[in-house]
Amino acid sequence: MIDVGSLSKGMYIKYDGDIYRVVDVNKHFRARGSGLIRTKLKNLSSGLVREVNFNSGEKVEEAEVTFRKASYIYNDGEMYYFMDAETFEQYGIPETEIEDEKNYLVENTEVDLIMHDGKPIGIQLPTSVVLEVVETEPGFKGDTVSGGGKPAILETGLKITVPFFVEKGQKVRVDTRTGEYIERA
């Protein structure tokens, strides 16, 4: 059991019989009283995010999760399949459990499988991935005055804003935490 005051973003806890990833933590302290810890927890089995308030001093159980290196191999419309890098065993994860992460997956993307009781319950992406631009408008000379960018659609269907000099067919590096363009690859 761990004190809720030590919760931080990215931790995994057991709460109400399910496993949750801590998405956000805000600590509020009142004068002459106990503090209030406001959290956003993502249920790893349903994908739903819920807000839970704890009083300081409460305890929660830390979930025992392990991480295994794996590669994304394919999807069949409902399940996304990954191959363990050590044992070459294949694991299927329902699309609903990786709703946010699927926009960054192309064949052979290296990920960490989040395992609980020997079963995969989610994935952890690398901090950036390289994706190809499949659709964007051509840039025009003089467009750089605004300093903005133009919309682009990547090979996975992800829509991002890229600088004007990026053209269709080029590969770009995208931050998986924010979904923003980093650089040309």
UniProtKB/Swiss-Prot annotation:
Cell compartments where the protein resides: Cytoplasm
Record pathway: Protein biosynthesis; polypeptide chain elongation
GO biological process, one term: peptide biosynthetic process
One Pfam assignment: Elong-fact-P_C
Keywords: Cytoplasm, Elongation factor, Protein biosynthesis
PROSITE patterns for the chain: EFP
Highest taxon, organism lineage: Bacteria
An example Gene Ontology molecular-function term: translation elongation factor activity
GO cellular component: cytoplasm
Predominant cellular place of this UniProt entry's protein: cytoplasm
Function: Involved in peptide bond synthesis. Stimulates efficient translation and peptide-bond synthesis on native or reconstituted 70S ribosomes in vitro. Probably functions indirectly by altering the affinity of the ribosome for aminoacyl-tRNA, thus increasing their reactivity as acceptors for peptidyl transferase.
Family: Belongs to the elongation factor P family.
Protein name per UniProt: Elongation factor P
Source organism per UniProt: Thermosipho melanesiensis (strain DSM 12029 / CIP 104789 / BI429)
Gene name of this polypeptide: efp
